[in-house]
A protein has these predicted regions:
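Transmembrane helix irregularities
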Residues: 30, 139-142, 272
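Hydrophobic alpha-helical segments of integral membrane proteins
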Residues: 9, 51, 61-77, 87, ...
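Hydrophobic alpha-helical transmembrane segments of membrane transport/permease proteins
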Residues: 15-66, 151, 155-194
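An internal, D/E-rich "acidic patch" concept
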Residues: 58-114
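Hydrophobic alpha-helical segments of polytopic membrane proteins
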Residues: 6-8, 13, 151
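Short loop segments and helix-boundary regions at transmembrane helix junctions
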Residues: 119-142, 147, 153-158
């Protein structure tokens, strides 16, 4: 088990290095001049050239990349030309909002899919099975952008039940910063009014993001539970007189969860892509919105910093998934 984890860690290093390489050179291919952006539209060519020399933007690409890697190893992600702040400071500011949004969406989608997929498998061929499969198709097929606008139109414009976007109402005072997660910080400080307001702002973007997770996981859970129900050990457990709930909990779900856990790590990649759209539509001040604005402004350092952080989160989550998989399946642990 230790060797497997060590190999995963070594593989992570190469993956992250490859991401820095691809992101760096792609950002240089995109048309635009960061020095001009930093200097402003009224700056003279001499001032623009001075800034390019100062930040090393006129050096050969291989030299720029070497400087970038050296700074990266020292924890320096560079300077954002848009916010005029250190990229590491920006990421520390915007990342908690994205973690809160994506984490709630992943949890909601997984739990609902676990319940729906299991019920659909146990009631195969019934109306409950058909409803579960239909909801899975809807979750996978509805475009994220269209669903976000539709929910805004229905629940904010028409019904007025939920806010349009943002993390809090304009007049609401944020809780003291502890974790950066507004729901957690408001509970830790006993500010329940802020907690309710933060949850209200979370509902629509979380539902939009969770739809894709739910759609894929329902199909996987249904198929996995059906496969497990046909195994000899399940029929043996039922023949011994064990209750349906005990058979489900101890024998069916433990084995049916293996494919679901594997896909769960890949789902984060889909969430990362959806976050860019959802945060833009709902004006959610997270890392996806920050990266989207950085790409539009051709802000090299901010784009690469945000991409690297998302990549680190992705490989770390997949490492955790691998470890959980080793725990769930002893055949791999002792192989």
């Amino acid at each position: 088990m230790g060797m497997l984890i060590a190999r995963r860690l070594a593989f992570m290093v190469f993956v992250l290095w490859g991401i820095t390489l691809v992101t760096f050179f792609l950002s240089r291919v995109v048309p635009g001049d960061p020095a001009r952006l930093l200097a402003g539209p009224q700056a003279s060519p001499a001032e623009v050239a001075h800034l390019a020399r100062f930040y090393g933007l006129d050096d050969p690409l291989i030299v720029q990349y070497a400087h970038y890697l050296r700074n990266l190893l020292h924890g320096d992600l560079g300077f954002s030309f848009v916010t005029r702040r250190n990229v590491r400071t920006d990421i520390a500011t915007f990342l908690p909002a994205t973690i809160e949004l994506a984490g709630c969406a992943l949890l909601l989608g997984f739990v609902l899919a676990l319940i729906t997929g299991t019920v659909a498998a146990y009631r195969r061929g019934t109306s409950a099975d058909a409803a579960g499969r239909l909801s899975a198709i809807a979750g996978l097929s509805l475009p994220v952008f269209w669903m976000a606008l539709l929910l805004q139109l229905l629940f904010h414009t028409k019904l007025g039940w939920l806010p349009l976007g943002g993390r809090l109402d304009p007049g609401m005072t944020p809780p003291p910063h502890i974790t950066g997660l507004l729901t957690v910080d408001s509970l830790l400080t006993g500010n329940f009014a802020t907690f309710i307001n933060a949850v209200e702002h979370l509902v629509l973007p979380v539902v939009v993001l969770a739809a894709g997770v739910y759609g894929l996981m329902v199909r996987i859970m249904r198929t996995s539970v059906l496969d497990s129900l046909g195994e000899e050990y399940v029929r043996t457990a039922e023949a011994k007189g064990l209750s349906r709930w005990r058979v489900l909990r101890r024998h069916v779900l433990r084995n049916a969860m293996l494919p679901a856990v594997t896909v769960l790590g890949l789902e984060f990649g889909l969430l990362a892509a959806g976050v860019f759209v959802v945060e833009s539509v709902f004006q959610w001040p997270g890392l996806g919105n920050y990266a989207f604005q950085a790409i539009q402004a051709n802000d090299y350092n901010a784009t690469m910093g945000a991409t690297l952080v998302i990549a680190v989160l992705y490989v770390v989550i997949n490492l955790i998934v691998d470890i959980v998989y080793l725990y769930l399946d002893p055949r791999i642990r002792y192989a």
